Amino acid sequence: MKMRFLGLVVCLVLWTLHSEASGGKLTAVNPETNMNVSEIISYWGFPSEEYLVETEDGYILCLNRIPHGRKNHSDKGPKPVVFLQHGLLADSSNWVTNLANSSLGFILADAGFDVWMGNSRGNTWSRKHKTLSVSQDEFWAFSYDEMAKYDLPASINFILNKTGQEQVYYVGHSQGTTIGFIAFSQIPELAKRIKMFFALAPVVSVDFCTSPMAKLGRLPDLLIKDLFGDKEFLPQSAFLKWLGTHVCTHVILKELCGNLCFLLCGFNERNLNMSRVDVYTTHSPAGTSVQNMLHWSQAVKFQKFQAFDWGSSAKNYFHYNQSYPPTYNVKDMLVPTAVWSGGHDWLADVYDINILLTQITNLVFHESIPEWEHLDFIWGLDAPWRLYNKIINLMKKYQ
């Protein structure tokens, strides 16, 4: 399968080069393809700030901030704070890569919120450590356990100290909800600092997941390591950027690139802004660790919401003081929670969502959008009126 995919990529590259040489029709490349997140924010006329935060275990994370919108720049008073946390293989650009009137980060800023966007360890913008380098295996020895235990507390506490606020609204997408459910159920002091949890396409159990990722997850751990190594998994690269700006801007291949975005999550291509595909693909995937993917593989195999299994009783005892990984209990989380799910979501399957809903102690709202898949929550053309306006209304209701 790996060779077939490589062959397909080579064919696309050769065909693109031939097409360009013979005058094949390309659409204009969006300027954001070569921008970082701060530059994208500034490009759309919003104020942009960037901060580096060190976690308890030494990782250095990048936080992006939009302190106010274009419409309310004269209001210097404190604003309610929103923290946006991306999903698996993603980064903070997810919240600002659509047009300004359809990206949640920009919409919240214009609605009067102080918007902060996190970057999980190991992605494009969080590849530094106090003592380790990305060339060392030790740097990549993490999964969503550490993102919940270290990344979220460090980021949220920094934001509260910087803004002087006592609480934040937390918006998570996909794995951003996973680490939220873990952190807010395991760390009561952190949970008290969350005014409301907005869970978009939440993923806790993957018992009914139909994504190709689930098939990958059923492979033996040793085979996954043999295929992908021990370090990073699907990082953003110069080659991926080249594909995004050359292959994905070709009139004929643009739709193929759009469909590749849906390959792991479900198909709803009519709800994707095809003129933005080059921006999406030059920022995502943004990478994670192979160990994080192994953790998701374990979730598929064991069908449990639990910490990473280190593979032996001795190693588990070293990490957890017990011979098996501890389980996470969503019911222990008391944060008011609103959930949105999609009827065609291959990752956050309807049946898994129904199980999760019974476990949320303080569920204040749930809506299922029948036609939506996993990426509609961040890039859907109809997301502003079907989702984002409702999020803002709930924030104002529970302020």
Swiss-Prot record:
Prosequence residues removed at maturation: 28-76
Parts forming coiled coils? none
Can you say where in the cell this protein is located?
Lysosome
**In UniProt terms, what function does this protein have?**
Catalyzes the deacylation of cholesteryl ester core lipids of endocytosed low density lipoproteins to generate free fatty acids and cholesterol. Hydrolyzes triglycerides (1,2,3-triacylglycerol) and diglycerides (such as 1,2-diacylglycerol and 1,3-diacylglycerol) with preference for the acyl moieties at the sn-1 or sn-3 positions.
Q: Pinpoint the AB hydrolase-1 domain residues.
A: 80-380
> Which positions are glycosylated?
N36, N72, N101, N161, N273, N321
Report the GO terms under cellular component.
lysosome
Q: Just give the chief location class.
A: other
Q: Where would one find the signal peptide in this protein?
A: 1-27
For this protein, the record's SUPFAM superfamilies field holds:
alpha/beta-Hydrolases
- An example Gene Ontology biological process: lipid catabolic process
The post-translation modification note in this UniProt entry reads: Glycosylation is not essential for catalytic activity.
Assembly and interactions?
Monomer.
Q: Which Pfam families match?
A: Abhydrolase_1
TM stretches of this protein: none
For this entry, the protein name equals Lysosomal acid lipase/cholesteryl ester hydrolase
Q: Reaction catalysed by this chain? A: a sterol ester + H2O = a sterol + a fatty acid + H(+); cholesteryl (9Z-octadecenoate) + H2O = cholesterol + (9Z)-octadecenoate + H(+); a triacylglycerol + H2O = a 1,2-diacylglycerol + a fatty acid + H(+); 1,2-di-(9Z-octadecenoyl)-glycerol + (9Z)-octadecenoate + H(+) = 1,2,3-tri-(9Z-octadecenoyl)-glycerol + H2O
**Per the UniProt record, which EC number(s) apply here?**
3.1.1.13
What is the similarity comment for this entry? Belongs to the AB hydrolase superfamily. Lipase family.
Lineage of the native species?
Answer: Eukaryota, Metazoa, Chordata, Craniata, Vertebrata
Q: Does the keyword Secreted apply?
A: no
Per its UniProt entry, what is the enzyme's top EC class, as one word? hydrolase
